[in-house]
From Swiss-Prot:
Top-rank taxon, per record: Bacteria
Pathway connected to this protein: Lipid metabolism; malonyl-CoA biosynthesis; malonyl-CoA from acetyl-CoA: step 1/1
Origin organism lineage: Bacteria, Pseudomonadati, Pseudomonadota, Gammaproteobacteria, Vibrionales
Full protein name: Acetyl-coenzyme A carboxylase carboxyl transferase subunit alpha
One of the GO BP terms on file: fatty acid biosynthetic process
Family under the similarity heading: Belongs to the AccA family.
Assembly: Acetyl-CoA carboxylase is a heterohexamer composed of biotin carboxyl carrier protein (AccB), biotin carboxylase (AccC) and two subunits each of ACCase subunit alpha (AccA) and ACCase subunit beta (AccD).
Keyword ATP-binding in record: yes
Matches recorded under Pfam families: ACCA
Gene giving rise to this polypeptide: accA
Segments forming domain CoA carboxyltransferase C-terminal: 35-296
Amino acid sequence: MSLNFLEFEKPIAELEAKIEALRDVSRHGGDTAVDLDKEIEQLEKKSLELKQKIFSDLGAWQVAQLARHPQRPYTKDYLEHAFTEFEEMAGDRAYADDKAIVGGMARLNGRPVMVIGHQKGRETKEKVIRNFGMPKPEGYRKALRLMETAERFNMPIITFIDTAGAYPGVGAEERGQSEAIAKNLKVMAGLSVPVICNVVGEGGSGGALAIGVGDYVNMLQYSTYSVISPEGCASILWRDSDKAPQAAEAMGLVAPRLKELELIDEIIPEPLGGAHRDPIQTAQNMKDMLVKQLEELEQFDNEALLERRYQRLMSYGYC
């Protein structure tokens, strides 16, 4: 798979293009291949150093771009690499099946769990089918149905958050978008099973929160979580969406800042260059964190679990 490089990654892209060109020559270069091996090794070392330098000092706007990277792993990628025996469940049993939300039963290290997450889609056709990862009310009601099923069968719930926000169309509003989100918030706060929420890309406003109330909230290293997009914030504050970089810095939407404010619990590391550089390693990092947290939560009885979650939610806004 050829990688898409972001604007701030252009120096890395140029170096990697040179390395690939030399590899092609080396494969067909006969006697010159030995000399090229040394040059390739030097360029690879230089590329690694450049990546380490760039990714050690990313700004909030650059992180926001990484969170939206078109090759970033989505919910179905984590289902493939971190879980086994996934059985998808469809429909809200009231109106329709919203493809922007995927969910079903799976096993995590052999333990039955319910997995629910946003799914954006890769190709144009899939993006349209999945509405670019922006759920309608029926998507959130499907998620609610799966959560209630999980509670009935005493299965922990794992959610993956990656959406620009809930779909704001007229039809969605007519079918009760705000009610669907609000009901999910209420029900998730009172579920008697462990709930672990993970922001893996964009965590956009109520559309993210609707599957984001839990006992642990984790963020991948280069994900974002905010009430509005940087472009939207810039358009409101400065009437200029080009000021999105300044807005991103002011909003505090990156994982380290949110952990400092105690709005999230853990930051899950990504491979150098971002999750899309090594989705399998990212999924393994995610799995390790989920297994660890699930073991901790399973030590609590129902009453203690609910009290812990209540205290966690009530602590928001206090430093």
